[in-house]
Amino acid sequence: MAAAAAGGAPGPAPGPAGPPPPAAPTSAARAPPQALRRRGDSRRRQAALFFLNNISLDGRPPSLGPGGEKPPPPPAEAREPPAPPPPEPPTGLPARTPAPQGLLSPTQVPTGLGLDGQRQRKRVTSQRCSLEFLEDAVGCAPAQRTKHTSGSPRHKGLKKTHFIKNMRQYDTRNSRIVLICAKRSLCAAFSVLPYGEGLRISDLRVDSQKQRHPSGGVSVSSEMVFELEGVELGADGKVVSYAKFLYPTNALVTHKSDSHGLLPTPRPSVPRTLPGSRHKPAPTKSAPASTELGSDVGDTLEYNPNLLDDPQWPCGKHKRVLIFASYMTTVIEYVKPSDLKKDMNETFREKFPHVKLTLSKIRSLKREMRSLSEECSLEPVTVAMAYVYFEKLVLQGKLSKQNRKLCAGACVLLAAKISSDLRKSGVTQLIDKLEERFRFNRRDLIGFEFTVLVALELALYLPENQVLPHYRRLTQQF
């Protein structure tokens, strides 16, 4: 029975052993999923740090790493989906999280030095990018920045970077300068452009600004500022003598010239007499060969102080003269002021074709001279002398549209110096007022003063018969 039971219940047939029964879950078996999550987060963090640390400041990928080697390419794990989890470790063994190989960025170093390594990596990258931008800015290399530059000349051969502390040691013309801080990070970049190279600062253009002033017109031209027609100045080392404009006033000089039998050369100008003298010499007809037609016509005419202020000028063809037995009268019908002004200028141009200014413009300049003299508290006799200087130059045809204001200002300045007791402060104030009123540079005025003096033939002391008519009219108007 026992044998039958033993034979009837044979054991299992020999064969391959089956898998062991699953073990009960323990704390060691739950460790691998957490380690996988931490490892996935570490991969993503490392990929993000690698991407951020390789961003260049100038938009270009860095060419060299901190140690001079090229940076490795981005890890393949950062571009591919995460790999399947590895097989579970055998039961009873502690779960380990091995550090991924090939995923460390150049900025990462072993534990304990990671923070310092990242700071050093960022500092080196910033310095390298700043130096690369500095070299590109100094050498003007990138062609993409040409449309943003200020138009300064570009030197393609200049690609060398200079670190300077004193800008006076280098010539910064036509160059670009980049300012960096102590850590060599960019602060500012600018160019040095030449202004007015080879030109005077006081030079102005005729077509520069057309502002409407009380006397109208455009600004002073640099070509006509320092010259008058018929006036020759000693330029470019040329010696010019103005002795012909001087006449002897000492008796000894007169006798000495007579003893040698030398006759004084006649003056080719408008004759003038000394103040208080009753002798009036005849006008001379000779004229300098260097003067033009307008100057010849003006020099042959004797100056009349009542010519330009004649009240008959505005009448023109609009007046009607009635002659009676005992008196004569003039009747002027009503006419528009613009037509009256036009007719006056045409009549004046027909009588004085060599004068380049209109009569209305001449009178406007004289009104400005009088207004300026009132502001500076000048005496009426000073204004009268300035009128004589100005009208002489006008009738000689030496004034033009470009130099009329400079001539008027120079006449006021000469009259103030010769007839009033102005000190240095008073002369400075007068020059400031002239510069403000006539809108020219004081350097041009001072340079033009001698030109006007030569054009007047150094005759600043005037006879009474030339000054008194203007003085009477001014005292009635003041």
Swiss-Prot record:
Residues 11-24, 69-92 have a biased composition (Pro residues). Keywords: Cell cycle, Cell division, Cyclin, Phosphoprotein. The keyword Transit peptide does not apply. The keyword Transferase does not apply. It comes from the Eukaryota. InterPro entries: CABLES1/2, Cyclin-like_sf, Cyclin_N. Pfam families: Cyclin_N. Residues 36-46 have a biased composition (Basic residues). Residues 1-121, 257-296 are annotated as: Disordered. Unknown. Probably involved in G1-S cell cycle transition. Binds to CDK3, CDK5 and ABL1. The C-terminal cyclin-box-like region binds to CDK5. Belongs to the cyclin family. This is CDK5 and ABL1 enzyme substrate 2. It comes from Homo sapiens. The gene is CABLES2.
